[in-house]
Amino acid sequence: MYFDLTDEQQAIKSTAHDFLKARFKSERVREIAASESGFDEAGWKEMAELGWAGLALPEEWGGQGLGAVELAILFEEMGYALAPSPLLSNTVAGLALAFAGSDEQRERWLRPLAAGELRGAPALLDAGSSAVPLQFELEAEASGDGVVLNGEKTLVMDAASADFFLVASTDGRRHIVERGADGVTVKPEESIDLTRRLSSVKLDGVEVGAENTLPGAADDYLPVFHRACVALAAESTGIAQRALEMSIAYAKDRQQFGRPIGAYQAVSHRCAQMLLETENSRSAVYGAAWAADAEPQSLPLAASMAKAYASDAGWRVPDMAIQVHGGIGFTWEHDLHFFLKRGRANSASFGDAKWHRERVAEAVLAGETAPASA
């Protein structure tokens, strides 16, 4: 595997870093976190103008046609900046339409989504369920040519600002439901992460025409799930990188007993462990992203490896960073708690570390291996 970024990939990284640094300064992130909407509409429009809404979506449907490596680059920078944005949920919805939608559905929903004119969000987890990824309990009852949906989805990312949802039913199908449709109720849910809002979506006799049920079957969404895991793992890696850099800067600047605290092994060894976990997470993420583009048969294992490791690194590194900072790190006024909370929230989304380690164990025992070029 060639680990260096191409010139185009480096340009994406530099552009994303500079834009997010300017747009989402600490003060602005705090303002957004305290707002009712929880995201920056103007910032979203600028992201759409940069082509991010359709970065990994097919060119024929208005996207940029780039791959999972470019997607990972972008989401690592999103995590580094702790950007409050519906980009992740929108990207996952777009990928689902790209992989499993009909041409008519792609024209109606995917093209404006890729342009940033519409926002979609996957509605997967059923309220009161065991929260096992890829298992759904909501029944889609046949009604004429369409179906009727009754049930409640929980922990739906960015639901309050989405124009439509892709609702998963027990047969693995996805159904397009507009947020303003009759029988749809969206309510905010509590989350430790104020920079990414979650909501419940209640469906009470919601009628879905045949034209709004995606033709794809359950297995058609596996590539979408795995890419979502890679993107989220990349975001957690960016969180870890930012926490590491904050800690190193503080360890160099903070004086205790006439010396920078970084001169003491208790601090320097902790920073070394943070570096180790961040770099290992990054290696796993880009190995999985490479597999998605070049060796898709290895993607399920590689994606679970990346998500398992990054799920831990995304909160462990900020947690260690708080320890390096001492008392100031525990205060609301310091930014580290935002990174810790996003890392914790990310660790539980799209399967936690335990679930993904079980998938890795199953794959290894079945004789599967990591990407051949990794």
Residue ranges and their predicted role:
Residues 135-137, 155-156, 179-213:
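Flexible, small-/acidic-enriched active-site or ligand-binding loops
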Residues 51, 75-78, 171, 177-181, ...:
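Short Ser/Thr-interspersed hydrophobic loop/turn segments at strand-loop and sheet-helix junctions
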Residues 93, 118, 134-136, 161-163, ...:
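A generic structural signal for well-ordered coil/turn residues at beta-strand boundaries
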Residues 123, 150-187:
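A short core secondary-structure module
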Residues 116-127, 167:
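A short, Trp-centered hydrophobic/proline-enriched beta-strand micro-motif
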Residues 65-74, 132-136, 178, 207-208, ...:
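Structural signature of FAD isoalloxazine-binding scaffolds in flavoprotein oxidoreductases
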Residues 92-101:
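Helix-loop "lid/cap" segments that line or gate small-molecule binding pockets
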Residues 1-85, 100-105, 112, 116-117, ...:
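Alpha-helical interface subdomain recognition
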